[in-house]
């Protein structure tokens, strides 16, 4: 492994004694290792008992089943309004809201669906993220009202006969993102050869190619642009499907409910399982939702600048020099997130002593864990449970940092930050180094 673009340090956890290092004071791009810093800051300031909260309100009289007034949804940055914790049922929460309305005797809403997403600002994507990738799932927009990770899937079905146009349907159903399908139906045998794209700035997903005349297929997740509109349209569509038609319009407005509003439902989700999604599965959308929530709770508005300011306070508060941590977002998608291996190790040692350190470490990926980004690494019986940490991968960057227990029982902290390297060669180098440490440390 060449020396340029490389920063490594391995130290004893208890003493801080460095046993191996290369360019350890040299800052490198850290990719998703960034998520360790944002999740630790969120846990530090929000606490392990924190809950995200989204509320549904109604206003007006109910007569003969009709609400002569509007509905209001107030967003709190919750990334979990999806099927992730509900057996993949992305309609689960909306269906509960429909039940709450029906229990109030409502079967139709005459007024508008008002959406308050003012908890965050309206900068939905970080300006330092790669351009031209806005339709990729990992660049889903960040909003105080978000639904289904702000992505859609396209289900592609064959037509009735070979040669007929295939059928493309968007899930979740909404009136914002539409499918335009030119794909044709092929024979029974063969594999689908389909291109699914959403041009930048467009709400139309194009589907082209050929699908076999059997079964159906789903695309990879496709990020949407208008998070608030997607939330509102999906909710309106689901309420209609649940027998609650909405007569008015979707309106985005920062209304705070007063005594004229009646609370219909409160949806809450817990911080710690959310942090586990970030650190185990490296879900960038989750990381940025939490990062802006931290900013909104502490400084009154969910912005990246506020979140980065809070993060500096956190680093200083745990005894670290914040000027040594050049961080630009909460997920690591910005290539400008640069930290030296020695400073990552110092952070890991500080978190081991943190009052919430054990809870935070439990959110990290574990070698061989099928639910984490380390599921294909350190799977051998002798490595089981030995490696706990965070992976990072963007173009030309492969990083790994965390804690490892050697055969001797001694625990080490490590940061292996590789830039200008391919993913597979980076993983191979990191894994060899960690395995050597386990055997000889």
Residue ranges and their predicted role:
Residues 16, 35-42, 113, 145, ...:
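Residue-level preference for non-acidic, small/hydrophobic
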Residues 1-14, 18-27, 53, 100-105:
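Beta-lactamase-like hydrolase cores
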Residues 21-41:
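Short active-site loop at a secondary-structure junction
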Residues 5-8, 275, 287, 312, ...:
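Short glycine-rich loop/turn motifs
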Residues 19-21, 92, 281, 291-441:
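Small-residue-rich helix-loop
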Residues 26, 79, 418-422:
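A generic structural motif
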Residues 22-28, 221-222, 331-334:
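A short glycine/serine-rich beta->alpha loop
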Residues 45-322, 439-440:
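Conserved serine DD-peptidase/penicillin-binding transpeptidase domain
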């Amino acid at each position: 492994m060449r020396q340029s673009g490389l920063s490594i340090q391995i130290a004893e956890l208890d003493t801080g004694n460095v046993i191996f290092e290369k360019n350890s004071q040299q800052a490198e791009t850290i990719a998703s290792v960034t998520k360790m810093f944002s999740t630790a800051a969120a846990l530090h300031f929000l606490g392990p008992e924190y809950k995200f909260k989204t509320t549904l309100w109604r206003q007006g009289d109910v007569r003969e089943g009709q609400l002569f007034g509007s509905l209001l949804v107030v967003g709190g940055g919750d990334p979990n309004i999806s099927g992730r914790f509900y057996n993949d049922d992305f309609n689960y929460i909306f269906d509960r809201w429909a039940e709450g309305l029906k229990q109030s005797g409502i079967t139709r809403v005459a007024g508008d669906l008002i959406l308050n997403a003012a908890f965050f600002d309206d900068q939905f994507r970080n300006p330092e993220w790669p351009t031209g990738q806005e339709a990729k799932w990992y660049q889903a927009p960040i909003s105080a009202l978000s639904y289904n990770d702000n992505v859609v899937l396209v289900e592609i079905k064959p037509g009735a006969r070979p040669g007929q146009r295939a059928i493309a349907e968007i899930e979740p159903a909404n009136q914002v993102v539409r499918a335009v399908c030119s794909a044709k139906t092929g024979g029974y045998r063969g594999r689908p050869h389909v291109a699914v794209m959403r041009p930048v700035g467009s709400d139309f997903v194009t589907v082209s190619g050929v699908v076999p005349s059997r079964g159906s297929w789903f695309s990879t997740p496709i990020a949407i642009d208008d998070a608030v509109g997607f939330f509102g349209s999906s909710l309106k569509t689901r309420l209609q499907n649940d027998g609650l038609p909405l007569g008015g319009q979707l309106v985005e407005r920062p209304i705070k409910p007063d005594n004229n509003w009646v609370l219909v439902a409160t949806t809450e989700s817990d911080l710690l399982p959310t942090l586990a999604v970030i650190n185990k599965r490296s879900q960038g959308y989750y990381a940025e939702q939490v990062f802006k929530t931290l900013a909104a709770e502490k400084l009154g508005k969910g912005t990246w600048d506020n979140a980065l300011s809070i993060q500096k306070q956190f680093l200083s508060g745990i005894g670290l020099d914040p000027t040594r941590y050049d961080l630009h977002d909460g997920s690591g998608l910005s290539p400008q997130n640069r930290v030296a291996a020695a400073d990552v190790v110092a952070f890991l040692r500080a978190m081991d002593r943190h009052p919430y350190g054990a809870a935070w470490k439990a959110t990290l990926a574990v070698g061989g864990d099928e639910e984490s980004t380390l599921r294909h690494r350190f799977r051998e019986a002798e490595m089981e449970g030995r490696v706990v940490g965070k992976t990072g991968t963007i173009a030309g960057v492969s990083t790994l940092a965390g804690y490892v227990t050697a055969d001797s029982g001694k625990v080490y902290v490590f940061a292996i930050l590789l830039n200008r390297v391919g993913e597979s060669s980076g993983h191979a180098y990191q894994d060899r180094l960690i395995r050597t440490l386990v055997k000889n440390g």
